[in-house]
């Protein structure tokens, strides 16, 4: 079946901003889909609100819409572009839900758009819990005992009533029929919140019946959500009703499945691809080391599945294919999840995703099989046997089922430290923000590689303190000790695997460990094997012969771990290893277990002696001139997709320039680890040892021009010293200049020399010094550790008690394991040792200042300021969390001139080669330099999409030796970023709903996971789009609540008057209400939470408030208003905590009321 010729244009819906449960794996799949369909000659139309994606690069689609992904906005794009088909399977749950909404709205039928990849019936059958359960029963597959709680009958009755009202109105035929129909629709839409509450109440009554049927503990799974949003495990009735309420609220269909507990069962996933001719292949089997009860995105997983018998595997394989056939996924990839009772082998189907997923990306990277690319081609009519497998160079067709001869381990990365008050317990609702993948010839090797690739300071299965046991406890002799171990192993946490290892070290039997944690005994035996070898190393030291040292390395032991076990330095171990000529060899990911030769250079390291006739090193290093790009490792808050975008652009530009581009990274979600992004990909941890070994192999042939460390965030920068010591050339800005920008003393001298201002500041190398510096500067002040990204542990300190708490509670969380072991019982000693290496930096807090980000390109002489971004929030909120606009929207031109002058002076002084970011604060007309980052920043993709020039590509060419002018010439003339002819607004997206109990108030530590971009000719509309893209539904009418501190009352007045003038009712607390009344605004008084009921929180929970303006002052006021902020979050009420934010949203609402949003492709802005 050749590709279809009856469709010419295809709309792809992206996944939108990076959120927990839906991250950059969908940029990877969407990018593959765009390339695959363009390759086939289709006109590709893309909508995605996330500017940090490769898929939104204008060359990847014919029309690229960076617009909010809402059904209404996508409907406008369909009306404008008239696509023949819609591919909804590449953009996660966002794309599926949007596609289903478009179908329900009649948009697809109206414009004759066909859904391809998975039709609406298949999506409904897979995502609707009732339909899925019926489908599984029909084909003889068991699902856990369950019951649905929904309000389908009530919804249907409401819909019929609404349709009857429309029909009656049409029958009356009034003169103003269209206006009357619009008014009816407006009333219907405004009543959505009230209807939702009725539906939830109705479903809660059914849930009570379900509880009697299913019993406790119970699993709650909301329909049509991602990453387990709103779901969880209930162990008692109170938890049950709380989670059901949350799940019903999260589900767009107000439906949850209440399921019997299968906690402790083994969990497996199958990645399946099916074509129209019913050819089916299993791309990969995945086994979760964590048993059922932990979301698969939060579980440590391995591929292939390691503890299945062949008979069990074949049963699961056949069941997976039967599921796809019954659901009706005809063209593309799907993920099917199973649970197996280890006691009796009972197999149940948990769920399936009728689309590419997080697991699809992992399976693609684990096997080399490009699931998203193949799925896109199947969607347009091809069959698997007609498509070539790129990895084998076409030696095998895509219908050839992948086979692998290695083990892959994925470990998630968490960010609980960013959310004080959040309990670090894992459930069926996903909480991880990133993941690392490692490849080894054995499970032990891949596990230890993954642990060190996490970049959390681990060198392997490092020791850990079990809560409830004394520090350094080595034996569990007492009942209390055993109870502490049981509690630690029985509670799923990010550190549970290390707790398991520690319990085994302390003499707990494997049988007891299994009983406590339910992890399969085979995995426990493998961990015990590592620990037994650790004990031998402690006793006998580092082997002095190559055979035994190679054996240790083949088990995954890093030089740093061996050094820790023998109480020496990693450099000592490395010297012994090099003296014995023990080095890794590099193997290829080839999809066929070496059955066919693979031309694709997708490599991983391992330690083994090659068998007779085999290549010792399959890397096949070329003789070309080459550049190595270090990636960013696992995603985390503060270092995410924006840096991967920069690494990809560097690879693209260098390949275009004739260099061989070599990528090193260990993140399976990203485009940078796609097999065709670079000339050669090394999927290995970003540690000094692993990177230097790769460079050693690459230097065996050809010329290594250098290594790029400034695109991957803080991760590669930390390796700069080791690279320099090894004599490896670093391209672009020198490590010394990068260090100068981080070193407060040196940086201060540079600013003084240049005549630039900075806030009054100080530096502390000890606890005592910190107190002295704070005393000299006075409060409030900003404190942060040096050499961190994302504002890690950065705080605004208001008084002495806050400083004391920061030093004794927050700083110890930064202390690495080696320092803790050196000072086991001396917290002050630990802190002082840490600060000796990474001092604390103190700045006077510039209250009310405007913060500005400036990005620039420099070749050491010439400078181009590519963007000046004005923050909408005032200084004090981390730049990554603040909304900002490009170009500036309120700064006078003379201040912009001064910012450009200071930026150019800094770039020249630091001899920047490539990119530089400067953060400024402007107060009372004075420009203060806050910090300088002579590297890529997270604003690079946003700036590039706004000005229409790929600044990361230009920077890469500069690093390779081109001048700024020559590098720019490849991509068009230098634009004027001050007057691009349009306005772009970047807005941050937060995961607060995932962390109950956490305060949503923003500060200097970054907490957003992603971003969106609003693009328009008008600032108000661009801001409105940014809010819609971030999931904030701006009200067109309703009630505004205002409560602001005294110094903000005058400033808030214009925004309140604007909304009151648009017909909004105003509620206010007593002081604010008096002020508003004195200034001509009618406002109704309402109680604060502490003033008695009914109070403002009651009004918000009763959906009587549609938007909130609230500013606070001082710790007590912040604390007192926390419950108010949580209420707005849970009720999805827009909440603005700054004067500038309030002013911007008031203008945005006015613009929306004045007319509808227009949509334009990126290409139209730069035509």
UniProtKB/Swiss-Prot annotation:
Q: Where is this region: Allosteric domain?
A: 1032-1167
Pfam families given in the database record: CPSase_L_D2, CPSase_L_D3, MGS
Q: Which reaction does it catalyse?
A: hydrogencarbonate + L-glutamine + 2 ATP + H2O = carbamoyl phosphate + L-glutamate + 2 ADP + phosphate + 2 H(+)
Cofactor(s) for this UniProt protein = Mg(2+); Mn(2+)
Question: Which UniProt keywords are listed?
Answer: Amino-acid biosynthesis, Arginine biosynthesis, ATP-binding, Ligase, Magnesium, Manganese, Metal-binding, Nucleotide-binding, Pyrimidine biosynthesis, Repeat
Q: Which GO terms describe its cellular component?
A: cytoplasm
User: Oligomerization domain: where is this region?
Assistant: 456-619
Any single biological process term in GO? L-arginine biosynthetic process
User: What's written under domain?
Assistant: The large subunit is composed of 2 ATP-grasp domains that are involved in binding the 2 ATP molecules needed for carbamoyl phosphate synthesis. The N-terminal ATP-grasp domain (referred to as the carboxyphosphate synthetic component) catalyzes the ATP-dependent phosphorylation of hydrogencarbonate to carboxyphosphate and the subsequent nucleophilic attack by ammonia to form a carbamate intermediate.
Q: What's its job?
A: Large subunit of the glutamine-dependent carbamoyl phosphate synthetase (CPSase). CPSase catalyzes the formation of carbamoyl phosphate from the ammonia moiety of glutamine, carbonate, and phosphate donated by ATP, constituting the first step of 2 biosynthetic pathways, one leading to arginine and/or urea and the other to pyrimidine nucleotides.
Question: Mind telling me what this protein is named?
Answer: Carbamoyl phosphate synthase large chain
Q: What is the lineage of its organism?
A: Bacteria, Pseudomonadati, Pseudomonadota, Alphaproteobacteria, Hyphomicrobiales
Gene designation per UniProt: carB
């Amino acid at each position: 079946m050749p590709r279809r010729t009856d469709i010419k244009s295809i709309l792809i819906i992206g996944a939108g901003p990076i959120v927990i449960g839906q991250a950059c794996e969908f940029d990877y799949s969407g990018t593959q889909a765009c390339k695959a369909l363009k390759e086939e000659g289709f006109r590709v139309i893309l909508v995605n609100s996330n500017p940090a994606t490769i898929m939104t690069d204008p060359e990847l689609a014919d029309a690229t819409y960076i617009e909010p992904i809402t059904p209404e906005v996508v409907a406008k794009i369909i009306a404008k572009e008239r696509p023949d088909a819609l591919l909804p399977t590449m953009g996660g749950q966002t794309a599926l839900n949007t596609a289903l909404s478009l179908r329900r709205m009649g948009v697809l039928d109206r414009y004759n758009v066909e859904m391809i990849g998975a039709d609406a019936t298949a999506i409904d059958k897979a995502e609707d819990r009732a339909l899925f359960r019926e489908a599984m029963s029909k084909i003889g597959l068991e699902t856990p005992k369950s019951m649905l709680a929904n309000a389908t009958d009530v919804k249907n009755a409401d819909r019929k009533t609404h349709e009857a009202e429309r029909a009656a109105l049409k029958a009356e035929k009034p003169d103003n029929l269209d206006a009357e129909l619009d008014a009816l629709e407006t009333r219907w839409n405004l009543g959505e919140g009230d209807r939702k509450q009725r539906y939830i109440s109705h479903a809660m009554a059914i849930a009570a019946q379900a509880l009697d049927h299913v019993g406790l503990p119970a699993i709650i799974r909301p329909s049509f959500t991602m990453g387990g949003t709103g779901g969880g495990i209930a162990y008692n009735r109170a938890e049950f009703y709380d989670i059901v309420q949350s799940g019903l609220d999260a589900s767009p269909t107000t439906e949850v499945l209440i399921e019997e507990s299968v906690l402790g069962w083994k969990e497996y996933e199958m990645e399946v691809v099916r074509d129209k001719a019913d050819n089916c292949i299993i791309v990969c089997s995945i086994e979760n080391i964590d048993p059922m009860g932990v979301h698969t995105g939060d579980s440590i997983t391995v591929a292939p599945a390691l503890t299945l018998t062949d008979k069990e595997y074949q049963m699961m394989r056949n069941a997976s294919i039967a599921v796809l056939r019954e659901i009706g996924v005809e063209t593309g990839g799907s993920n099917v999840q199973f649970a197996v009772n280890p006691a009796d082998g009972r197999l149940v189907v948990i769920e399936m995703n009728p689309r590419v997923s997080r697991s699809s990306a992992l399976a693609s990277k684990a096997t080399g099989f490009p699931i998203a690319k193949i799925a896109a081609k199947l969607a347009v009519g091809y069959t698997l046997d007609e498509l070539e497998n790129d990895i084998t160079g076409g030696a095998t067709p895509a219908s050839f089922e992948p086979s692998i001869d290695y083990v892959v381990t994925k470990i998630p990365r968490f960010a609980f430290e960013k959310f004080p008050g959040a309990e670090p317990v894992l459930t069926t609702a996903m909480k991880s923000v990133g993941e690392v993948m490692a490849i080894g010839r054995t499970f032990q090797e891949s596990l230890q590689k993954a642990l060190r690739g996490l970049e959390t300071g681990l060198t392997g299965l490092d020791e850990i303190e079990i809560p409830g046991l004394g520090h350094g406890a080595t034996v569990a002799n007492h009942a209390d000790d055993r109870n502490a171990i049981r509690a630690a192993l029985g509670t799923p946490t990010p550190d549970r695997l290390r707790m398991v290892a520690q319990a085994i070290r302390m003499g707990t039997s494997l049988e007891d460990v299994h009983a406590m944690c339910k992890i399969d005994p085979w995995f426990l035996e493998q961990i015990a094997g590592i620990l037994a070898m650790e004990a031998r190393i402690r006793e006998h030291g580092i082997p002095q012969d190559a055979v035994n040292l190679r054996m240790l390395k083949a088990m995954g032991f890093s030089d740093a771990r061996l050094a820790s076990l023998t109480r020496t330095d990693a450099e000592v171990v490395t010297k012994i290893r090099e003296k014995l000529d023990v080095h890794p060899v590099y193997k290829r990911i080839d999809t066929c277990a070496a059955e066919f030769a693979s031309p694709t250079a997708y490599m991983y390291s391992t330690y083994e002696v090659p068998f007779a006739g085999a290549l010792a090193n399959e890397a096949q290093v070329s003789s070309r001139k080459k550049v190595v790009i270090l990636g960013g490792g696992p995603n985390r808050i503060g270092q995410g997709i924006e840096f991967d975008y920069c690494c990809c652009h560097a690879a693209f530009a260098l390949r275009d320039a004739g260099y061989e581009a070599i990528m090193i990274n260990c993140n399976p979600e990203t485009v940078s680890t796609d097999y065709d992004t670079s000339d050669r990909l090394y999927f290995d941890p970003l540690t000094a040892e692993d990177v230097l070994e790769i460079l050693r192999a690459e230097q065996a042939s050809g010329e290594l021009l250098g290594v790029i460390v400034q695109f991957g965030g803080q991760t590669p920068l930390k390796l700069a010293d080791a690279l320099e010591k090894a004599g490896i050339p670093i391209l672009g800005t020198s490590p010394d200049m990068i260090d100068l920008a981080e070193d407060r003393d040196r940086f201060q001298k540079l600013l003084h020399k240049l005549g630039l201002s900075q806030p009054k500041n100080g530096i502390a190398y000890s606890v005592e010094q910190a107190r002295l510096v704070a005393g000299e500067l006075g409060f409030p002040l900003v404190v942060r550790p040096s050499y961190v990204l994302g504002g890690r542990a950065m705080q605004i300190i208001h008084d002495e008690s806050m400083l004391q708490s920061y030093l004794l509670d927050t700083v110890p969380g930064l202390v690495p394991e080696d320092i803790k072991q050196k000072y086991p019982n001396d917290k002050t000693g630990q802190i002082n040792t840490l600060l000796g290496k990474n001092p604390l930096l103190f700045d006077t807090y510039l209250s009310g200042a405007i913060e500005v980000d400036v990005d620039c390109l420099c070749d050491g002489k010439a400078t181009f300021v590519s963007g000046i971004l004005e923050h909408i929030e005032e200084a004090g909120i981390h730049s990554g969390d603040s909304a900002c606009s490009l170009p500036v929207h309120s700064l006078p031109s003379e201040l912009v001139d001064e910012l450009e002058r200071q930026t150019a002076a800094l770039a020249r002084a630091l001899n920047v080669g490539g990119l530089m970011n400067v953060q400024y604060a402007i107060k009372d007309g004075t420009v203060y330099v806050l910090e300088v980052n002579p590297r890529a920043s997270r604003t690079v993709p946003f700036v590039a999409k706004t000005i229409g020039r790929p600044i990361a590509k230009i920077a890469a060419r500069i690093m390779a030796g081109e001048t700024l002018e020559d590098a720019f010439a490849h991509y068009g003339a230098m634009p004027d970023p001050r007057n691009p002819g349009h306005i772009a607004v970047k807005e941050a997206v937060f995961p607060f709903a995932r962390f109950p109990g956490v305060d949503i108030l923003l500060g200097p530590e970054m907490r957003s996971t992603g971003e969106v971009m609003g693009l328009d000719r008008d600032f108000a509309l661009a801001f409105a789009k940014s809010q819609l893209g971030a999931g904030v539904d701006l009200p067109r009418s309703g009630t505004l609540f205002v409560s602001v501190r005294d110094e903000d009352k005058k400033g808030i007045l214009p925004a309140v008057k604007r909304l009151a003038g648009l017909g909004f009712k105003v509620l206010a607390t007593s002081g604010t209400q008096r002020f508003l009344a004195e200034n001509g605004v009618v406002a109704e008084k309402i109680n604060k939470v502490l003033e008695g009921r009914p109070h403002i929180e009651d009004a918000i929970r009763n959906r009587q408030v549609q938007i909130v303006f609230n500013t606070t002052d001082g710790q007590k006021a912040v604390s007192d208003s926390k419950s108010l902020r949580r209420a707005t979050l849970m009720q999805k009420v827009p909440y603005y905590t700054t004067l500038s934010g309030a002013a911007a949203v008031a203008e945005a609402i006015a613009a929306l009321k004045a007319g509808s949003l227009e949509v334009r492709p990126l290409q139209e802005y730069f035509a």
